[in-house]
Amino acid sequence: MVKEFLGEGSQAGQNLLRLVSRGNAIIAELLRLSAHIPSVFKLEDRNEARKYQDILLDFKYLSNPDFYESKIEENADLVDLETEFRDNHIDILIRFYHLFESIYKYIMDLEHYIVDVEKGFYIHLTIEAILINGDGKQLLSEAVYLYGVMLILMDNLIEGPVRERMLISYLRNKGPVDLPLIDEVCKLCKSTGYIPGSPKKPPNYPEEYFRRVELPENVISMIVGRLRSDDLYNGTESFPQPEHRSVALSTQACMIYVILYFIPDILNNKNSIMREIVDKFFPDNWVISFFLGFTIDLSVAWEPYKAAKTAMGNTIIQSNIQYQTQRFWKEVSELNKLVDDLLVDGLLVEEYIVDNVHKIITTLRRCNVTIRWVMLHSNASQKKFKDLVLMGGSQEDVLYLLLNTAQLEFVFKNIFQQLLATKEEKWEENKKLASDSMVELSEYFSGEKALTRVKKNENLQKWFGEISQKISQLDSTDSTSTGRKIQQLSLALEEVEQFQQIDSSIQVKQFLIETRQFLTKMIKIVNIKEEVLVNLSVCADMSYAWEIVNNYVDQMQKGIKSDPKCVLKLRATFLKLVSILDLPLVRIAQCSSPDLISVSEYYSGELVGYVRKVLEIVPKQMFLILKQIINMQTNNIQEMPTKVEKERLRDFAQLDQRYDLARATHSVSVFTEGILAMETTLVGIIEVDPKQLLEDGIRKELVLQIALAMDKTLIFSGKPYQAPSNKQQQQEIELLQRLKELSNILDGFRRSFQYIQDYVNIQGLKIWQEEFSRIVNFYVEQECNSFLKKKVYDWQSQYQSVAIPIPKFPSQSDQNSQQSVNMIGRLARELLNQTNCKTTLYLNQIGWFDPSSGKELVGINTWSILHQSVGIFGLTGLDKLFSFMMVKDLQVFVSQTRSLVEKSLKGFLNEFEDYLRPTTNIPDTMIRYQQALDKTKLLYPIFIDVLTKIGQIQLIRRQISNQLNFHCKIDSNMLFSSLDIMNKSLLNDIESHFQRPDSNPYPSDDNTLLFDLAQYLDTAGINDPFTKIYITTSPLEQFPCLLFLFVLSQVSKFQFNSKLNVMSSKKQKNSYDWTPFIIGCITILQQFHSLHTQKFLAFVGQYIKSHINIALANPKENNKDDADYPEDVIGLLRFLEDFCKYSHTSRKIVEGYVPPYIFDYYNN
């Protein structure tokens, strides 16, 4: 049974294999999640730490949970903050908890497995028996080793305090009822006090950490004993030379390093065992990769342990370090020359490789051992040791050796695989040729063949016939006996040449020589075995370099800069790095685990990310040259007119400038040639297409350049226009200056990108449109996050990409930008700043201008330049951001108003409304109006600020909509017409639905037509921002009356400006703009039922009629010489006229509350 430990019927073997497979999958998830720890849990940012310190608790919460819960519950702000925090982070918290729980379950399952084996659950099987079996000792050692790796990686990649905050956050949100293992998981994940990267470690770390969930010590001791004595993975077959023994046993060395922490007594007290371990595994190395490139310096790690430190003394003595350094750096220089000689064009052909398999494999083995030692020890933790190693030679030589070794491996593998594929064919071909030669010689000595003129020799005839039969019977499957037989046959043929009858015949001798050559080829062919490639893949393993290889990115990029064709060698290096995937995937694949795909995708994705990182230098260099092209096209080369006079042709030739442009263009194409020359490469399970790789790199660099240009350009002083001094005039036009500057930069990029697209084989304008829209939408999304309870994080955003990331910039700290996350927010707030209702006046015909100087601040020209600079995507993004701002203001305003009415004004307003009812009657006196105004006057400052800001935003959105509408008609009239017709058709359908709901049903919930069409309509500017519903509100019956009183209190503060044909503020101080005021009122009324608007108009109409009635009854009291109507009546009539104009309310509706003759008299 032990012999078939991994057989299908072996439950013990299959269970252990599944456990090890699960361990590898858990580690992949740990690595994946550790890269996505929300920054808030680290509390590195002071503002975040201050904000969340009361709800982000560590394990101190467990000592007195009631105290902390009551503290949160008593504070409404903390309750809201926690709700928001939970909504944003619960998904990632669930994944982290499942990870921590999986680690604990893995440990418990491993412990249960060991207990089951010891109790005899698996018949005739013991721990000792498992450790005797080849597969058994590998799997059991790996299972314990992976447990240790999980603990080390968890403490290094997810710091203790972070783990505690995550667990407590998850516990408080889920409750202990659903979490049966929470106590055990908390015990395992409790902070160890260790800070990654810190030279100081807590006392007894990590052995105390490893002891939190203990495994049987006797089992660990047996595993360590097996690791000490056996070659578990038969590494010496791939590394037969004695000087390579430490590399041959390197996998075991990593395992024994980790497992020793489970029995620290060996590290502390067992001098003889530690000396044996060091002599066997670490005689010439002290820096190891214990898992996928995570390195450890044993001179530091084993410093606290007496026996281990003593044992390592001989290895880290300076003389030994100097000797090993000199030895390996000498190997670097020798091997570079040797590999260069092997890579000479035309040398590595099938015949040469067949003849020199052993020589090439030996060379590659030496190369890999040397690269491994130098790379690892160049990464030593102790500076004095690291300096000694680095002094030995240049890292460029190491990289050169790595590239050439990878190229040699790549070429050798390809040719050797072809030889394996054609092995049988060539074997049969040479066997037939050799056999036929013997048959011909046999016939030759028969003396019967025409023209032979040779004396018949029956013995030779018979002998050659027998040799022919023996050759025909040779079998390539048994290489050992076949090789011996071929040698005997070859020797026999050599001896037969001595016969006089043969020696005298040149023709026969030639036949014999050729036959021996065929036999020699057959010996070489029979030695072409799969084992050669298996051993080579073991030697070429680079799992130790998962992290270290990042140190060579800059040097690789320098190589590409100086020689773009160097990319071809890099392809072989990338393929060599794929060997990294073998270690974590081999067991998962072996048990056909469903985790194989997700784990493969993760590791392959990380490798592809590295490939992109190395090759991104190509688009970087391309964009450096592109900047020169932009400068030439923008400043040096004149644009050719449609028609030009013959005499002026020479002026437009600009031969020198065009030569410089051509040279720069050629440089770009040369840079891209290298990548495009690469073949499609399979990196793990991800296919890397060089053309796509180049395009992604270009996209990434384009995104970076556009984002940088926008971030650097869209920075504003944040000061509103005040007075027309020279300095302030510069501030006044700052917005236009910035927009023009950005427009010029982006236009230069766009033109040059369009120019260069054919030379690098890409669709330039398509890429430009896609990436620019993604950039703007991402920054708008991030800016809108501040208005959302449930945030959209980078990794959740549909616009963010791992391969083509959009950069994030720190927020600007100036006065205007303090609330802005990025440049889109700064631009939006600068527009609000320049159109401030307190300092500007809005006219429909021109936009916003300064009333004191008459200077236009934001007009038609501004929107045109804004379109040129940020495009359609920028305009729609700004519109979306302004919508979010307005919705936030509307929600806060309605909530505050409702709260104030419920608290103190509800009774009074109900009483006042009762007095006014019915609104068709005229009240007896105006005193009640004044009393109501006095009662509610404290609300008016809040109302005027909020409503004018809402109106201001709505006016800006209307201007954006007009700009989008205009450009859609010009640039895409067919699309505009189609959308317009579709919109009208749908409106008709909706209308008919309300008229006959039974025969014309409303679309079902899963029909997204209205939602999808609305997005197109907004982008095309076919909308009316003023009449939209932005928030859902419950009825607030007193609101129409309250809004009426507010409007009544404000209209008297405005007067009609006959020159501008608009109402303007009487006082310059604390003044507001008329148009935003009206539009703010329209917008707020649209958020309620239409009955609210009717009630509001009824109150206004009643007041106008009653006031006119009183004024006409007492003409002496009306002190206006130029009008029969009182001042506030005139203001209200103006208000109603503009209300109808902006809200598209029918005049007939208003005339139902205010008789038309009143308007006619007022207008005349």
Curated annotation (Swiss-Prot):
Which Gene Ontology cellular component terms are annotated? cytoplasm; endosome; phagolysosome membrane; WASH complex
Q: Which GO terms describe its biological process?
A: actin filament polymerization; endosome fission; endosome organization; exocytosis; lysosome organization; phagocytosis; phagosome reneutralization; protein-containing complex organization
The GO molecular function terms of this record are: identical protein binding
Q: How does it assemble?
A: Probable component of the WASH complex.
Q: Which family does it belong to?
A: Belongs to the strumpellin family.
Mind telling me which PANTHER family this protein's record contains? Answer: WASH COMPLEX SUBUNIT 5
What name is this protein filed under?
Answer: WASH complex subunit 5
Q: Which organism is it from?
A: Dictyostelium discoideum (Social amoeba)
**Higher taxonomy:** Eukaryota, Amoebozoa, Evosea, Eumycetozoa, Dictyostelia
Q: From the UniProt record, report the name of the gene that encodes this protein.
A: washc5
